[in-house]
Structure formats: C-alpha cells, structure tokens
Amino acid sequence: MKKATCLTDDQRWQSVLARDPNADGEFVFAVRTTGIFCRPSCRARHALRENVSFYANASEALAAGFRPCKRCQPEKANAQQHRLDKITHACRLLEQETPVTLEALADQVAMSPFHLHRLFKATTGMTPKAWQQAWRARRLRESLAKGESVTTSILNAGFPDSSSYYRKADETLGMTAKQFRHGGENLAVRYALADCELGRCLVAESERGICAILLGDDDATLISELQQMFPAADNAPADLMFQQHVREVIASLNQRDTPLTLPLDIRGTAFQQQVWQALRTIPCGETVSYQQLANAIGKPKAVRAVASACAANKLAIIIPCHRVVRGDGTLSGYRWGVSRKAQLLRREAENEER
C-alpha cells in the first residue's frame, strides 16, 4: 500500500508546475475557470494559481462538481497503471510501420520527451529508439523466414528504404538479410571439437569472432546443434590461426583465471543481448536469481523471458548463464546439463576460496 504523504498547497503547486509524474496518485488539482480536474503530470497549459484548488483524490474532485480531464484521465484509480498504459501505448506506436520521433511520441502520450524517455527505459529496460529497432529486426526476421524477398522484408519491417537498413544490417541481424533468409548462406564458419574439463566442446568461429561454444558428450550432437544455428553456412577450413583460437578457448574454459580476449560474434535479439551483457557482469564465484537478473536489466516482470534468453546463449561459460539459479538458490535447467552447471559453480567457488 502506498504510504500517505502530507503536502502543503505550495508543494502541490510546485509539483503541478514541474508536471511531476511521481506526484500522480498523491492528489489531483482542479481549475475553477474550466471546471476540470487533472493529475499533477498533466501536459495541459497551466492555469493561474488563484484559479487552482487541490483535492486528495478524484472522488473528492468529482463530488465538488469538477469533470475529469480527457487528456490525463485522473479518474483512473491506479496512477502506476495509468503510467504503464501510457508506455504500452507508446510501444504500440513505435511498432507501426511509419517511424516516429521521440517528440512526436511524447506528444501522443501526453508526456514531455524527457519524462517519456526516462519512464520508458525504467519500464522496458530499453530506450524508445532501441525498442523500435528491436521491433524492426523482429519483423524483418519473420518476413525473411516466410520467404519474402529481401526488399519486401526490409520495407515491411518499417525501414524507409533499403539504404537505411543496410547502414544497420550488422547490428540488426548479425549478417546480411540475404544470408539470414538462406540460413547463413555464404557465411563462412569454421569449427573444431576438443576435450575440456566439462566433456566435449565445439568451438565455432565466423569472420567476426567466436560465434559458438557448445558443450556435450557426443560429437555428432554438437555438430548437429551448430548446423541448426547456421544451416546454410560454408564450412571454412581450420587454419593454424583458428587452431590457436581453439586452444585459447579451451584454456579459458578449463581455468577461469585465464580470461578469453578473442573477439566474440554475439548474435541475438536486442533483449537477449541485454540479458547476456548483464550476465557478463556477474563476478566469478557468485550467483544471482532469474528475478535479480530481470531487475538488473530494468524488467522485473520479465523473469520467464530472461530465463529463455539464458537458454538461448550460444557461448557456454564465456557468457556465464550458469551463474543464474532459482530464487531459493537451487539449480535450475542449463542448456548443457544441470550436472555441468553444478560442476562449474563448485569449481568457481573453490577458485575464489584459494
């Protein structure tokens, strides 16, 4: 339950002048000359102070004969829900084909650009621009997966033209649209299998860097898993440089005090990359819960989505999804087996004690 606060009328007026969204739910203000009452954060033009009166809630303002503002809808009981509704509306506007600027978006949801940007990021964990880019990337993937042409897919995703897409092609899909459509066609990926302390390991590398580190017990299963990631990629020869890279990866997997300095080719959605980036900040020897990880990226309600992002990790140990446990501290699922997860955590705990 929200704790009641005692504000003077002068303090309330300052909140109205600042259009402070944090004051929503604390009180409403009414304007005698218009007969309308509003939330403190309402974007309507300010009235003169002498024409403004304050009420504890919408019920009192209604009882005094005032009408609710159609713009800020102060009669809604839950101010937090009201703000969430605005962000939800902003998300739907960002998902339209026509790009929208922050200023235009703020105007449509009746907020200042500054407050919208801050509240949007606090609610979704992403900026409005990043949300729009992630949505475009999703639509592009879906369209390409359906067999649509590259040009049609680019336009359907909301890019104004092909050149706008190609300037951001690498960060949108991690490869060209044509390569994505054909399962990584013409994408050179080399791989090697080796033993490590955790069993068999498959290390794969693209032109951009290490793109997969997979663990298992059966070579055929590991190769099949890689082929599902890049079904049409070319199998590049394993040259001496790549063999050295494989040795560095194995050394890093076997000894956690040997950090991997090789470039990584991390491919995933904007949300997945956000989760994976947060995972890499968890210190060796420590664990967090899925809820704590969701909180860390600013999305406390996205616990299941966070767990799915952990399960989609393609770079075992380097992106340490094994450091995420249930809320009660017990081990949950792990892409490469719960027993490996337990082994990794024991090893890291022992290393920290030395």
Swiss-Prot record:
Q: Name one GO biological process term.
A: negative regulation of DNA-templated transcription
Report the PROSITE patterns cross-referenced here. Answer: HTH_ARAC_FAMILY_1 (PS00041), HTH_ARAC_FAMILY_2 (PS01124), MGMT (PS00374)
**GO MF term (any one):** DNA-binding transcription factor activity
What SMART domains does its record include?
Answer: HTH_ARAC
> What triggers expression?
Up-regulated by methylated Ada itself in response to the exposure to alkylating agents.
Its EC number(s): 2.1.1.n11, 2.1.1.63
Which residues bind DNA per the record? T34, R43, R45, R67
Task: Tell me the active site.
Answer: C38 (nucleophile), C321 (nucleophile)
The UniProt family comment states: In the C-terminal section; belongs to the MGMT family.
The name this protein goes by in its record: Bifunctional transcriptional activator/DNA repair enzyme Ada
Please name the source species.
Answer: Escherichia coli (strain K12)
Q: Which gene encodes it?
A: ada
